[in-house]
Amino acid sequence: MDSVTPNSRPESFPEFDSAGLAAAVDALAAQHSGREDMFRAAVVQLLKAELVKARAVAQAQLLKDRHGRRCAERLCFVQDEIIRILYAAATQHLYRSQVPSGAERMAVVATGGYGRGLMAPESDIDLLFILPYKQTAWGEQVAEAILYSLWDMGLKVGHATRSVDESIRQARGDMTIRTAILETRYLAGDRPLYDELVERFDTEVVQGTAAEFVAAKLAEREERHRRGGQSRYLVEPNVKDGKGGLRDLHTLFWIAKYVYRVRETAELVERGVFDAHEYRTFRRCADFLWSVRCNLHFVSGRPEERLSFDLQREIAVRLGYTSHPGMQDVERFMKHYFLVAKEVGNLTAILCAKLEDQQAKPAPVLSRVISRLKTGNSWRRVPESDDFIVDNNRINLAAPDVFKHDPVNLIRIFRLAQKNNLAFHPDAMRAVTRSLNLINTELRDNPDANRLFMEILTSNDAETVLRRMNETGVLGHFIRAFGRIVSMMQFNMYHHYTVDEHLIRCIGFLQEIERGGIDEFALASDLMRKIRPEHRAVIYISVLLHDVAKGRPEDHSIAGAKVARRLCPRLGFNNADTELVAWLIEEHLTMSTVAQSRDLSDRRTIEKFAAVVQSVEQMKLLTILTTADIRGVGPGVWNGWKAQLLRTLYYETEPVLTGGFSEVNRAKRITAAQAEFRNAFTDWPEDELNTYIGRHYPAYWLKVELPRKIRHARFVRASEDAGHKLAINVGFDPARGVTELTIFAMDHPWLLSIIAGACASAGANIVDAQIYTTTDGRALDTIAISREYERDEDEGRRATRIGETIEQVLEGKLRLPDAVARRTTRGKQHKAFSVEPEVSINNQWSELYTVIEVSGLDRPGLLYELTTAISKLNLNIASAHVATFGERARDVFYVTDLLGAQINAPTRQAAIKSALLHLLASDDTAAQPAA
C-alpha cells in the first residue's frame, strides 16, 4: 500500500502549479467570505479549468514521449493535488472545526486503480473517507463538499465512508473490499488514522490468509477471461480486462503484495519470484499497455478499454508505427500488442507456479486454475530421460545444464510433458526461455529433434503443447517461418485471432475431427478415417503451416507452399509427401471459395474443381484442411450450411474423379436425402409429402441441411394453410451474430433486389443468402442479416418491418428507392477498413451462364445496389451466391443476357465490369432501380 509518495511531482510536469492553485483558492475564500455557494462555484470553475489544461499538457507529452506510465502518473498527480486542495478548502474555509474532538478526524484515501498512483484519462476516481468512529455531521459535510465539487467538475467518483473498525470487518468478509484496501494510498487529512488502518489490515486481515486470497484472485481472473473470451489473441482485445492486459498485471501485483508484503514490483526480485530480466519485462509490458490505454481514452473521449478496429489505426499512428512491405502500420502495432500480452501471460504463469510450488497445501481453486492436475509432493525421474524430473506433478530439469549439453532437450521436454501429462515447473520455464539461443541450424536439422516435433504435432493434446511451445518462444525459433507470424494480426473483421493462435486452434479442431463423434465434422471425420495412413502426418503439418506465410508481399498461399517445400524434408517427409503438403497449402482456400460462391449443380463447376484436386485422396485431404481452417477462424463462422456445401461439393466431384460424372450416384444421394426427410414427417399424409418433395429441384436436396429442410417444410405448409401470398419466418442465431429471414413468395425477376432493398431500408446488412426456386414458381429464400439488437424481440420487430416493406413494394404501394434512401450508413467498424474493389467476369465456370464475381467493402444496401445495377445492364440473374468475410463482401451472380445467352463480347464484358467497379468504389451511393 501507499507505493507512491504523496506530493511527489512527476518528471517533466512543472506546468501544474499546486501551490499557486492553493493560494488562489485561499484568495477566493477571502473574496467570497460568508457566501458559501459562490465560493464553491468559483473553486470548481478554477480547478476545472486547470484540470482541462493539465490534461491537454499530459496528452501533448504523451504524443511526444509515448510514455503511457508517465502520462498516467501525471494525471494522477493532478487529481491528487485537486483533492488535497478541495480537502483544505472544506476543512479550513467551509467547515473548520470550532471544537476539535477525537471524532472530528478524517483521512482521505485513494483506492482501486487510483490507489496504485496511475490514472487513465477517463478513469473513475475511487475514494475512501476513513473515520475514527461512526460518521459525524462534520465528517459528512467535509466528504460531501469534496464529492460534490468533483462531480461538478464532471468527474466520475466512486466513494465509501467507513471507520477503521468497519473497514477491517468488511475486508474480512468481502474480497473486493479487501483488494481495495490493499491498494489504498494516503491523500489528505489525518495520517495516523490511515496508518492505523494499514497496520490493522496487515495483522487482522492479511496474516494467515494468503492461500485464500490467491485462490480468490485467480478464480476471479479465470472468470474474467471466460466472460471476455479465453484467448489473449482476440483481434479486438480489451486492454484493461482482456487476457494478457493490465488487469492481469494488477492481479499479479495484488498477489505479490499480499503474499510477499512488497510495495514495489522490484522487491519481487529480492524475494526470488522474478529475476532481473523478468522484472524488466514486467515494467516494459506495463509501460506499453499504459501507453495504449491512455491513447485509447484520449482518442475516444470516453473510458474505452476495447481496442476496436476503428481505433486501432489511429493508436498505431500515435505510437509511431509505420507500414512495411506485407504489413500495415496497424498490423505491426497489433503484433507488438499481442507479443506483450504473451509476455504478460508468461509472467503470470511464473508467479502462479512459484506460489503453488511454495505452498505446502495449495488451495483447491489455485491448484485447478494453474495446473488442473492432482497435487503431489514427491519428485521422481521422468521415464525415458535422466535429464528431467517430476516435481509436484511438474516437469523440471535434473541439472542446470541439460539444454546446454544436449539442445535436443529443448524439444524433448515438451514431448515428455505431453506423454506424461505434466505441467511445467517455473524453473523449467525459465530455463527454456533463457536457452532459446541454443536453437540454431544444427538443432533445426537434427533428426531426433524433428522426429520429436512431429510426435508432438500428431499426438494427443497437441494444441496445448504447441501453445506452450509458442508462448515460450521455442516453436518460433525451431520453425522460423512460424516465428514470423507469432502474434501477427490481420487487420480485418473476418479473423478473430492472431495468425499463430489460429493455426494452433486449427490443430485442436483437427484432433476433434480425428476423434469423431461431432455432427458438424461428420464428413471430415469420415474422410480422416479413410485417408492413407502415411498421409496423417501430411494433413497435420499442412494444417499447422497453411497460413504460415501471412504478412509477406507475395500471396500467402503460394509463399506458404514454398515454405513447405523447404521445411518438410527436414521434418522427415519424402519428396512426394512434401509436394502434397505444398499443394494443400497452395490450394487451401479453393474448396471453400468454390463451395460458397459457385453453382454446385453446374457440371462445368464440378469439372473445373475436379481438375484442380486431381484425385479423391487429395480431395479428402483438402476437405479436412478446409473444415479445420473455417472452424478455426472464430466462433460462429463454421455452420451447418457451410458443412452442407462442402459435403455437396465433395460428393458431386467424387464421381468425376472415379471414372465419369455418375448420375446414378447423384440420384442415390438425392433419394437418400429425400428418405431422410420423409422420416421426419411421418405425420404428413403420403400424397402431401410426395407433392412437397416434388416441388424442389435436385440441388435443393443436395445442398440444404436436414434441419433447415424441416423448418422450410413446416413454414411453407403453415403459410399456404393460412393463404399467405408472402410469408416470412424469422430465426435467431446469436452464436453467428445473425438473424435469418426466410421468405416464401411467388418468384419475381426483381425479388432478390426487392429483398435486399427492404433489408437496406431497415439498416440491415446482408451477410449470407440461400436462394431457391420451387418447380411451381415459388421463391424460398433465406437471408442472414447482421444482428443489431441484443433481444430477440427487437430483432423480430426489425424483421417484421422488412417483411412489410417487401409486401408494399410487391403490391406497388411503396417505391423502393425512397425507402432505401433513408437507410443506415455503414458502421464505424467498416469505416476503419479499405478493400480494393474487384470484378471478374468469365464463362469458364458454367456452360449456360456468365459468372460475375464482385468483391469489395461491405456496406448496408450493397447487394441491393449490385442486383439493381446488374438488372439495369439488361442482364438476367439466374442465381446469386452471397457471402461476407468480415468487412469484405464477395458476391457471385450467374447471369445471361435478355435472350438467355452468355455474355461473350469483350466490349460488353468491359462495360459491365466498369459499371460494377464504379459502384463498388462509391461510398454509400445507392443505385436507383427501374420503376
Curated annotation (Swiss-Prot):
Stretches assigned to the ACT domain: 740-822, 851-931
Segments of this protein annotated with the region Uridylyl-removing: 384-739
One example of a Gene Ontology biological process annotation: nitrogen fixation
PROSITE patterns reported for this sequence: ACT, HD
Signal peptide: none
Record-annotated HD domain positions: 499-622
Gene3D superfamilies: 3.30.70.260, Beta Polymerase, domain 2, cca-adding enzyme, domain 2
Activity regulation behaviour: Uridylyltransferase (UTase) activity is inhibited by glutamine, while glutamine activates uridylyl-removing (UR) activity.
SUPFAM superfamilies tied to this protein: ACT-like, Nucleotidyltransferase, Nucleotidyltransferase substrate binding subunit/domain, Poly A polymerase C-terminal region-like
Pfam families: ACT (PF01842), GlnD_UR_UTase (PF08335), HD (PF01966), NTP_transf_2 (PF01909)
Name of this protein: Bifunctional uridylyltransferase/uridylyl-removing enzyme
Organism per entry: Bradyrhizobium sp. (strain BTAi1 / ATCC BAA-1182)
GN (gene name): glnD
